[in-house]
Amino acid sequence: SRRQRQMCIRDRLDMLLFVEERINTTIERCGSVISVNDFLASPDKMDIFDATCMRLQTIGETVKNIDNLTNHELLINYAGTPWRSIIGLRNIISHEYLSIDPEEIFKIVKVHLPGLLLAIQQIRNDIAASI
């Protein structure tokens, strides 16, 4: 029904907004992180690293849920974003935490998250325009 479709669209928009907020929070809270060593320099810095990993995990989990909710038909339209890698990182953080490479996390935060943010914003805009 039309109402169910609107609810489903609203759920997608809410989930995308959640991802956008998590990305913004991660970028903001890692603003003082200039090198990978900044994640490891002290117990407080290691707390930032751990919190960053947990936010990346929730981003990956939510992306996975969006993909499942849309029967794998939404994210595929945005092929420039490495969705499988985002979900894969979630799996590594969840199941292989001791094997996490701080350099990779640093690179993800500083290099890849801004692009993911743009992709999420584009998807939200495209969905909103289709309502």
List the predicted regions and their residue ranges:
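Secondary-structure edge/capping motif, primarily at the C-terminal ends of alpha-helices
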Residues: 26-40, 66, 70, 97-100, ...
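Charge-enriched, short contiguous segments at helix-coil
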Residues: 94-128
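Short, contiguous, well-structured surface segments enriched in hydrophobic/aromatic residues
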Residues: 55-67
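Short, mixed-charge amphipathic alpha-helical segments
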Residues: 68-84
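Histidine-centered, metal-coordinating catalytic motifs and their short helical/loop contexts
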Residues: 82-100
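Generic structural signal for well-ordered, non-transmembrane alpha-helical segments
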Residues: 17-20, 24, 57, 91, ...
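Single conserved hydrophobic/aromatic residue that forms the stacking wall/gate
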Residues: 1-9
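N-terminal first-folded block
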Residues: 12-54
